[in-house]
């Protein structure tokens, strides 16, 4: 589908476009739900491209995506609140399929002339979904009944003209609705794991109703990215920050594949790395990547900048700013450098901005997107900014990166600075490195390294009294953090065996003399974040 050329201010005119050489997409409008990004993940898992955009995004901003359908996310608002977000009118004018989820369903109802009312019986948690009709394209192959996850206080009192109730729950007579124009609404969340058959509904919408093809692969993404990188860079020169993690490794490999020796990689030792991190990283890159690499020892520079800084947000800003200064300095030494490459991922972008929906609060600045000073002289190139972590790993595999690089656990850009609560000092860094080395060694020995998303130690600013032999001690408290996750947007604490935790704790208090107490963090995300700072 294309938008016809039009005079300024005229209504958009939609034209069917069956050219399959154009990449198809599903466009998801974000109304502020904590699950919005999860919808995008579910669509991507089907090998169909999608993007999450603000609910008020104009057509001109998404026309290039060649949308085959629209999804309206859930959200915390009520359609009758002053300033409540609504769907753009063009989605209904486009004649393309629309699926509203929770608040998205209520927005459809309200905008198309139905009635939404506050429900006396709110539904939060599990419910059983029962079909109201014999056949439905949206509910095809759904078990009867099917458990779903409800989270709403408003309900549909009267459907818009032409709509039919397709399914119900005990407290929700219109749990699913639809019309002949392929506009549908769900009063539950099919994207969450608590709706075990929700993927069936999403697949029905994407393939049977929107007629998408499962042709978005990492191989295609590589070719498209190479083309885009060459177009963006031209004859320019690029420097890429190597961190040792999979994100920067994939970025470097992808850009090198596109422009070869126009890329120079810079590995900065900022003094915030784990034990043996620098040596291991340089070894892997020199032996497997075959790129130009510059090693920069900036330990004193970073630690001096962090002196006296205790606020976690300020730490991130200081580190991000100092990184840019280092790269600018190195760029001057190299001559004319035009671009800085970064491994920014989709969740980084979503979590760092106030929201694509303007309805969610900023959680924390990401080191790749929040710490950049306004005066930065280098232009950014971020070829992974629309990918999830698991997609980056698949991309790395497609690019031929070694498994030891692809399957490394994520390590934050600010490094150990945000795993030390309070001021970062050389003494605290050595304590944390020793404790973290023990955690990682024992996790690997127990063959659980690839079963958890991240595992690490945190050096708190708490000290407590202990006894070692016949002597009183007053040492630091170290926390152990291990989580399971798919994409870092949500995470659950890992149920590590007690015996393993016991070994880790005993080793830390015996081998790291400044520590006399170890605790295990059993918080999930949300409400906690994975990192403590």
From Swiss-Prot:
ATP binds at residues 243-249. It is an enzyme of class 6 (ligase). Gene3D superfamilies: 3.30.300.10, 3.40.50.880, HUPs. Keywords: ATP-binding, Glutamine amidotransferase, GMP biosynthesis, Ligase, Nucleotide-binding, Purine biosynthesis. One of its GO terms (cellular component) is cytosol. GO terms for molecular function: ATP binding; GMP synthase activity. Pathway: Purine metabolism; GMP biosynthesis; GMP from XMP (L-Gln route): step 1/1. The active site is at residues 102, 189, 191. Catalyzes the synthesis of GMP from XMP. This is GMP synthase [glutamine-hydrolyzing].
């Amino acid at each position: 589908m294309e938008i016809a050329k039009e005079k300024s201010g005229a209504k958009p005119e939609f034209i069917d476009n069956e050219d399959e050489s154009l990449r198809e997409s599903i466009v998801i409008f974000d109304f502020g739900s904590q699950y919005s990004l999860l919808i995008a993940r579910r669509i991507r898992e089907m090998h169909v491209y999608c993007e999450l955009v603000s609910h008020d995004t104009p057509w001109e901003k998404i026309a290039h995506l060649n949308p085959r359908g629209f999804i309206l996310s859930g959200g915390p608002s009520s359609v009758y609140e002053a300033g409540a977000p609504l769907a753009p009118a063009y989605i209904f004018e486009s004649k393309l399929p629309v699926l509203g989820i929770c608040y998205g369903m209520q927005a459809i109802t309200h905008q198309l002339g139905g009635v939404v009312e506050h429900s006396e019986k709110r539904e939060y948690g599990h419910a059983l979904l029962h079909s109201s009709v014999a056949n439905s394209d949206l509910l095809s192959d759904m078990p009867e009944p099917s458990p779903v996850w409800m989270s709403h206080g408003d309900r549909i009192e009267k459907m818009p003209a032409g709509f039919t109730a397709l399914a119900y729950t005990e407290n929700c007579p219109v749990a699913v609705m639809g019309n002949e124009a392929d506009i549908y609404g769900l009063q539950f969340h099919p994207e969450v794991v608590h709706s075990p058959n929700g993927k069936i509904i999403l697949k029905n919408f994407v393939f049977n109703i929107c007629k998408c093809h499962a042709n978005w692969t990492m191989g295609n993404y590589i070719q498209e990215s190479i083309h885009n990188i060459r177009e963006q860079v031209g004859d320019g020169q690029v420097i890429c920050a190597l961190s040792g993690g999979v994100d920067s490794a994939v970025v470097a490999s992808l850009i090198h594949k596109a422009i070869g020796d126009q890329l120079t990689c810079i590995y900065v030792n900022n003094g915030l790395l784990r034990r043996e991190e620098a040596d291991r990283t340089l070894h892997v890159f020199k032996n497997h990547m075959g790129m130009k690499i510059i090693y920069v020892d900036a330990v004193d520079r970073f630690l001096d900048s962090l002196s006296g800084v205790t606020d976690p947000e300020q730490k991130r800003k200081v580190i991000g700013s100092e990184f840019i200064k280092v790269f600018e300095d190195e760029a001057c030494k190299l001559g004319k450098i035009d671009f800085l490459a970064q491994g920014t991922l989709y969740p980084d972008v979503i979590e760092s901005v106030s929201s694509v929906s303007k309805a969610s609060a900023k959680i924390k600045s990401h080191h790749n997107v929040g710490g950049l000073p306004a005066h930065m002289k280098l232009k950014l190139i971020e070829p992974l900014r629309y990918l999830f972590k698991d997609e980056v790993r698949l991309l790395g595999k497609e690019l031929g990166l070694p498994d030891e690089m692809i399957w490394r656990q994520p390590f934050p850009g600010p490094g150990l600075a945000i795993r030390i609560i309070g001021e970062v000092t050389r003494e605290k860094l050595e304590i944390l490195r020793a404790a973290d080395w023990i955690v990682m060694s024992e996790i690997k020995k127990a063959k659980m390294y690839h079963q958890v998303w991240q595992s690490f130690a945190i050096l708190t600013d708490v000290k407590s009294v202990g006894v070692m032999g016949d002597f009183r001690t007053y040492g630091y408290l170290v926390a152990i953090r291990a989580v399971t996750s798919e994409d870092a947007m949500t995470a659950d604490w890992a149920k590590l065996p007690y015996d393993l935790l016991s070994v880790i704790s005993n080793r830390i208090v015996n081998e790291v003399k400044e520590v006399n107490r170890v605790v295990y963090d059993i918080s999930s995300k949300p409400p906690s974040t994975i990192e403590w700072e």
